[in-house]
Amino acid sequence: MTLKLCGFAASNYYNKIKLQLLEKGVAFEEELVWTGTSEATLVDRSPLGKVPFLDTPQGPISESMACAEYIEDIFPQNRLLPEDPYAAAKVRELIIYSELHLELVARQLYPEAFFGGKVSDGTKERTYKLLRKGVAAFARLTRFAPFIAGPQFTLADCAAIVHLPLVSMVSKMIYGDDVLAELPMKDYIGLMNERATVKSVNADRKASTELMLAASLTKK
């Protein structure tokens, strides 16, 4: 069975799933799908028009965590969710914190940080407080021993390595303050960047980002 991962490699959520597939050694294809497209069939595959989504023999699956859980269930080799229910729950917990309480909060700043827009001072102030709160909570949960959940690479690392560098970058750009500065991010990113799978994902991300920038300049 071959899965098709749909979306674009500049998306951190797309790369979370791509890294999972590469780490597990699962054969898959990629289909370039941009968000914001008017393609009528897109909502049949991803009802909100979001990426990533998976095309499977049974049908499409949207939302990255649903995709990740499906992959773990269908392909048990090289498990990225522990078999122990508590340990697996702790990995899921870390993913939720890195996404819901960090990346999605920082996303409020993306219009100004990356897209030439402007974010209100009120939004910046509120976002900073939420980020500080989220980072403090995340720090209580994470291990960095040397991986996010402990000595083994897990799905939490697939999420962390695509989300946390963005949170760090955006906070420095908007506030001049890295909200993750008290975490051992430099060592962690260095460790992760030694993995061939992460190198591959990063190379594709850079190429996709350049393609996006070129497309946006063409529209102007």
Functional labels for PLM-detected ranges:
Residues 195-196, 200:
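A late-sequence structural motif
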Residues 205-220:
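Acidic/histidine-enriched, glycine/proline-rich intrinsically disordered or flexible terminal extensions
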Residues 2-4, 190, 212:
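Acidic/proline-rich low-complexity IDRs
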Residues 30, 151, 201-202:
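A generic structural-conservation signal
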Residues 1-125, 139, 146-148, 219:
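GST-like domain detector, emphasizing the conserved glutathione-binding G-site
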Residues 98-194:
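GST-like fold's C-terminal all-alpha helical module
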